[in-house]
């Protein structure tokens, strides 16, 4: 699709699944998890319009959401995205953490949403946000089948 250096983000590299587990583990109140999602979303760089044009706008989401990807020569996938909603940006950040730098086979072997369950995030999502998150997961799986 596009050169990944233009769609860099810290998720899956600097911010790892282990980082998120350690961050969310002490949070028992949904409001605290919500705040943490907003903070994660702030770390997600906004996509320039030219990358939004190359990325796929995901239907079924509460807010506008774009998801794109590239595949490195070693077969590892780099995903990037953006959203107009603060919470959705945070959810996208968690999703990018879960899928960044994995091969298509690795992504097909485990649900991209498994990390959300580990962090206790899916249970409190509204129906529309859950639907949007599922649409993002389906888009990732669809991307792995095109590799």
Curated annotation (Swiss-Prot):
Disruption phenotype: Cells lacking this gene display a high decrease in the level of ct(6)A modification in tRNAs, and show the t(6)A modification instead. They also show no defects in motility, fitness or antibiotic sensitivity, in contrast to csdA mutants.
Pfam family, one: SufE
UniProt modified residues of type Cysteine persulfide: 61
Active-site residues, as the UniProt record annotates them: 61
Superkingdom to which the source organism belongs: Bacteria
InterPro entries found in the cross-reference section: Cysteine_desulfurase_CsdE, Fe-S_metab-assoc_dom
GO molecular function: sulfur carrier activity
One GO term of the biological process aspect: cyclic threonylcarbamoyladenosine biosynthetic process
Family listed: Belongs to the SufE family.
Subunit relationships: Homodimer. Forms a heterodimer with CsdA. Interacts with CsdA and with TcdA/CsdL.
NCBIfam families referenced in this protein's UniProt entry, alphabetically: FeS_syn_CsdE, PRK15019.1
Function of the molecule: Stimulates the cysteine desulfurase activity of CsdA. Contains a cysteine residue (Cys-61) that acts to accept sulfur liberated via the desulfurase activity of CsdA. May be able to transfer sulfur to TcdA/CsdL. Seems to support the function of TcdA in the generation of cyclic threonylcarbamoyladenosine at position 37 (ct(6)A37) in tRNAs that read codons beginning with adenine. Does not appear to participate in Fe/S biogenesis.
Name the record gives this protein: Sulfur acceptor protein CsdE
Organism whose genome encodes this protein: Escherichia coli (strain K12)
